[in-house]
């Protein structure tokens, strides 16, 4: 969405920098997390614990989420595990903001009787998955192991979820620094203004050894 607006801003040489998400076909810089590396680290924890039938829930209208999925696929392939299409649930961002999405996740998981672990692409999906599992009478990690990207609340320690922690403050700081440099240099192209941050992972107790 709004791709035409961004192209017009670029045509007018107005500096634009993307935060967290971005468009591949624009020459604007961005500040992002290395989501593929993050996926490899999260999946390694599940695979090392003996999980093979791993489900994932991702947004197809969000490039960062697609990167997370690709990282998951690569991690499973590298470890000799099959990525099963029906173990992946795709949705649009707006859909995941609806309370009814919990029922959709519940139906998805009930269709995967061999699934033992779930990868959540962000905190919103994580909350929906927890609610769906509660409706199903399932426990974490006794029935399902769980990992989450971009946990955006400060409760990950209390929740005990293995996750990557959202770096909102640092990302905002990096965006501001780079945007000021672009304004000072009168640049609108990505000339080394992009920053790719290393993921920060928290190891909780949401993964069960099999």
Which residues does each predicted region cover?
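Short beta-strand/turn micro-motifs composed of small residues
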Residues: 20, 32, 58, 90, ...
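An alpha-beta-alpha
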Residues: 40-80, 191-208
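Alpha-helical structural signal in soluble globular domains
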Residues: 8, 12, 67-80, 128-136
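Flexible loop/turn connectors
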Residues: 106-210
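Hydrophobic alpha-helical segments within soluble ligand-binding/sensing domains
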Residues: 29-56, 66, 73-74, 97-106, ...
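Short acidic capping loops at alpha-helix termini that bridge into adjacent secondary structure
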Residues: 52-53, 83-87, 139-146
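Flexible loop/hinge segments that line or gate small-molecule binding clefts
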Residues: 1-38, 124, 150-161
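Short beta->alpha junction loops
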Residues: 87-98
